[in-house]
Amino acid sequence: MALSPGSQTPTLSEDSSILTADQVRSIVSALPARCRLCNWRLEYSSRRDGISLRSLYRAAAGKHCSGESVLVVRDTNAHSFGAFTSEPWRVSPRYHGTGESFVFTVEPQCVAYRWSQKNDYFMFGRGNCLAMGGGSGFALWLDEELLHGNTGESDTFDNPCLASETEFEIMYVELWTFEPS
């Protein structure tokens, strides 16, 4: 589903190293209604907090992270993409999340890929990686150093490659959560 900027502009706790205001509005237009009027809080930024999956998990377990989040990645070829998750990121032996989860591209074009209902492989976290989607492949996979990732077609979201290439180098990663406005 192609996204266009909606009328809702949330207040961001800090400037994003990845997203423009129009891109934020486009993502907001795809969010569940309960999240659309919320302000965004930057829980983790690789630019601010260093490049470490452990740091991202620690931020995701913080007092402000009780539920939904937006994970955004920018690769070294200036493509931006990410995921909305209905549950917090955590290390788990199995997939978790709900059908509200989706993956998206932001740059070069804003498009959301929603749950296909083919499986329920929404999100999982291990000590050495995190991933969205599954079946034929991961929609999004990031390594423990947050330096490399891969993306491909996933049965969960029926998405194409989200990045500039299936294997990519990461420039920035951000994790945003929602606060009532």
What name fits each language-model region?
Residues 1-69, 74-181:
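Phosphate-recognition beta-domain surfaces
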